[in-house]
A protein has these predicted regions:
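ATP/NTP phosphate-donor binding region
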Residues: 1-80, 90, 127-129
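ATP/nucleoside-binding phosphotransfer catalytic cores, i.e., glycine-rich phosphate-binding loops
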Residues: 35, 210-212, 237-325
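Catalytic core of DAGKc-family lipid kinases
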Residues: 49, 56, 98-105, 110-220
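Glycine-rich phosphate/pyrophosphate-binding beta-alpha loops
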Residues: 160, 164, 223-238
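Short acidic/glycine-rich loop or secondary-structure boundary segments that cap or lie
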Residues: 164-167, 216-218, 231-235, 259-262
Length: 325
C-alpha cells in the first residue's frame, strides 16, 4: 500500500504490515557497531512476525548513499527503513533517486538522534520497529538542498557554517569518538571538542541574504545554522519554531558575542531559552545565502561537508513520506 496524495497527514489502515514489503538499509558500523547489535535484535522479531523484507548492508566500500542510489535507480515506489544514525539519514537522502517515490521509516542507532526529537519517533529498537510495522500515520517531511561553495548536498535536519561545523569536522577526526560511543557516552566528545574550538576558532564577518533580499552584515560570527528541524548538535534546541513540513528554513546566526557570554548562553540553548540574548538572531525564509569573509567549515546533518566561504540553502521542491506513531 502506497499513499502519495498528501493532506496534512495520511492515515494508515490495519492491513499496513500484512501488505507492505520492507527494505531495511542497515549501517552496521553506526555508533561504533551499535547498528549491527540493533539489527540482531530486529531481525528475529521480523522473522517471528513473518514480515516480508529484504536487507541491504552498507560497507566501507559502498556506503549508504551509493547503496540507496543503486536501489532506487528504478524509480519505483519503495518502503525504505533506515537503521543508523543522523549521518546515515543524511547519506540516504543524498542517495534517493526520487524522494516522492519513497516511504521512509527510521530505527535510530546513533548518539545524536536529532532527527527523532522533533518528530517524536521512538528510540528503543523494538518500539521503533513497531512504529515501522504499524505506523499511526505518514507525514510529509521537507528535505533541504544546500550548495557548499557550489558542491550540492541535501540534508534532513540542518546545514551550517562556522563553529558548529568545525566541531563536526574535529569530532570526525577524534580518536576518542569510537571509544566513547562504545560506552554510550558519545555526546561527551562533542562537548569536549566544542569547548576547545570555542577558544581556538576565529570569528569572521559575514553577510546573510534572505530570499534574495538585501545583505545583512554581521561581525564576529561564531556560526550560522540553517534548520529544517528545531534541534541539532545532539539536542541543542536552536530554532524552537522550526517545522519539518512548512517549506521554510529557520536560520540562526550567532555573532558579536563576548566569549564569557557564550558559556552562559550555550547551556540555555538545550531548552530554547537562548533566543532572547543579544547576538542571537533567528530568521525564517525560503532560501538563504551566507557569505563568510574567510573560509569556514561547513556541514550537513552533522557530517563534515566542505571548507569554504559561501553556503546556500533552501527547501527542496519534493517531500518524503515518513512513518510516525
Amino acid at each position: 500500500m502506497y499513499l502519495i496524495t498528501l493532506p496534512s497527514f495520511v492515515k494508515i489502515t490495519k492491513d499496513w504490515c500484512a501488505i507492505t514489503k520492507y527494505t531495511f538499509l542497515v549501517n552496521p558500523q553506526s555508533s561504533s557497531g551499535s547498528g549491527e547489535k540493533v539489527w540482531n535484535k530486529i531481525e528475529p522479531e521480523l522473522k517471528r512476525r513473518r514480515v516480508a523484507y529484504r536487507v541491504l548492508f552498507t560497507t566501507p566500500e559502498c556506503g549508504a548513499t551509493e547503496t540507496v542510489r543503486r536501489f532506487t535507480a528504478d524509480k519505483r515506489r519503495h518502503t525504505l527503513i533506515v537503521l543508523g544514525g543522523d549521518g546515515t539519514i543524511n547519506e540516504v537522502v543524498n542517495g534517493i533517486a526520487d524522494v516522492s517515490k519513497i516511504t521512509l521509516g527510521y530505527i535510530p542507532t546513533g548518539s545524536g538522534n536529532d532527527f527523532t526529537r522533533a518528530l517524536n519517533l521512538p528510540t528503543k529498537p523494538l518500539a521503533a520497529l513497531e512504529n515501522v510495522l504499524n505506523p499511526g500515520r505518514l507525514v510529509p517531511l521537507d528535505i533541504g538542498c544546500a550548495k557548499l561553495d557550489s558542491v550540492p548536498r541535501k540534508f534532513a535536519v540542518s546545514s551550517g557554517i562556522g563553529f558548529d561545523a568545525s566541531v563536526c569536522h574535529f569530532v570526525e577526526k577524534s580518536s576518542f569518538k569510537a571509544f566513547l560511543n562504545r560506552i554510550h557516552l558519545g555526546n561527551l566528545i562533542y562537548t569536549g571538542v566544542a569547548l576547545k574550538r570555542l577558544f581556538l576558532d576565529s570569528r569572521v564577518d559575514a553577510e546573510v541574504i534572505l530570499d534574495d533580499g538585501e545583505p545583512r552584515h554581521f561581525s564576529n560570527v561564531y556560526f550560522a545554522a540553517c534548520m529544517n528541524h528545531p534541534y541539532e548538535g545532539g539536542g541543542f534546541f536552536f530554532c524552537p519554531e522550526a517545522k519539518t513540513d512548512d517549506g521554510m528554513l529557520d536560520v540562526l546566526v550567532a555573532a558579536d558575542i563576548p566569549l564569557p557570554k557564550v558559556f552562559l548562553i550555550l547551556p540555555t540553548a538545550f531548552f530554547g531559552k537562548h533566543t532572547g540574548f543579544s547576538g542571537v538572531h533567528i530568521f525564517r525564509c525560503r532560501k538563504v545565502e551566507i557569505r563568510a569573509k574567510e573560509p569556514l567549515a561547513m556541514h550537513t546533518d552533522g557530517e563534515p561537508a566542505a571548507v569554504g566561504t559561501v553556503l546556500k540553502t533552501e527547501i527542496c521542491k519534493e517531500q518524503i513520506l515518513l512513518m510516525v506513531p
